Amino acid sequence: MTTATQSSAPGVNVDQAEVEKFSALAARWWDPESEFKPLHAINPLRLGWIQETAGSLSGKRVLDMGCGGGILSESMAVAGAQVTGIDLAEKSLKIARLHGLESGVKVDYRAVPVEELAAEQPGQYDVVTCMEMLEHVPDPASVVRACAALAKPGGWVFFSTLNRNPKSFLFAIVGAEYVLRLLPRGTHSYDSFIKPSELATSARQAGLEPTGMRGMEYNPITQVYSLSANTSVNYLMSTRK
């Protein structure tokens, strides 16, 4: 995997600029017409894919790494999982907790680096999700290792991120951020995108075996997202420990 040059506290795998970027938008996490509209739109696809692969989430311990305002965390909790959501953007976690209180959905939100949690709770989770997150940290391979450590033997770890090629630059940055304005400008850095082969290598090195991959596409005419076999831009990868 490529590693972007980022500013972060010594020993902590975090890009402070990324944390501040999402903190500035925290109040709008649950507005389906805000900058987070794409996440609301793709969430049913993500949840369905996780359930299709890992089976029912009812009663399972699930970790949502990089949970932000809790969009995926809450939906997995509604599906019956015992969910822990972690993020380093305190403002986003505050919004997640408030929304959980309003909706009556119980999720344990914590501000802790995933590497620290892995040392604290190794092998404790049936399912670990790391969605739209790897491209926002200085050392994605470290996150993959931590996710693997947190999963139980036989547990599932799910990733989603962006492929790195000319098409993904055109679609995910030029198209999504500048033409269609689906995302704020500067949301993504092309150098931080990760090829599926790179993610698969990091997963195997961490003791995870990739089991499947799906692409995610957006139709600007119908404004609908769908899963597909096309992994050239957005893709999801399932792995098992």
From Swiss-Prot:
- Hey, which pathway is this one from? Cofactor biosynthesis; ubiquinone biosynthesis
Q: What class of enzyme is it?
A: transferase
Record-listed E.C. numbers = 2.1.1.222, 2.1.1.64
Tagged with keyword S-adenosyl-L-methionine: yes
Classification via Pfam families:
Methyltransf_23
Q: Which InterPro entries does the record match to this protein? A: SAM-dependent_MTases_sf (IPR029063), UbiG_MeTrfase (IPR010233)
Q: Which CDD domains match?
A: AdoMet_MTases (cd02440)
Taxonomically, the superkingdom here is Bacteria
Catalyzed reactions per annotation: a 3-demethylubiquinol + S-adenosyl-L-methionine = a ubiquinol + S-adenosyl-L-homocysteine + H(+); a 3-(all-trans-polyprenyl)benzene-1,2-diol + S-adenosyl-L-methionine = a 2-methoxy-6-(all-trans-polyprenyl)phenol + S-adenosyl-L-homocysteine + H(+)
GO terms of molecular function: 2-polyprenyl-6-hydroxyphenol methylase activity; 3-demethylubiquinol 3-O-methyltransferase activity; polyprenyldihydroxybenzoate methyltransferase activity
Which GO terms fall under biological process for this protein?
methylation
Could you confirm whether the keyword Acetylation appears in this record? Answer: no
- Which Gene3D superfamilies does the annotation name? Vaccinia Virus protein VP39
The UniProt keyword set, sorted, is: Methyltransferase, S-adenosyl-L-methionine, Transferase, Ubiquinone biosynthesis
Give the binding site residues for S-adenosyl-L-methionine: R46, G66, D87, M131
Described by its record, this protein's role is as follows: O-methyltransferase that catalyzes the 2 O-methylation steps in the ubiquinone biosynthetic pathway.
Family statement:
Belongs to the methyltransferase superfamily. UbiG/COQ3 family.
Under which name does UniProt file this protein? Answer: Ubiquinone biosynthesis O-methyltransferase
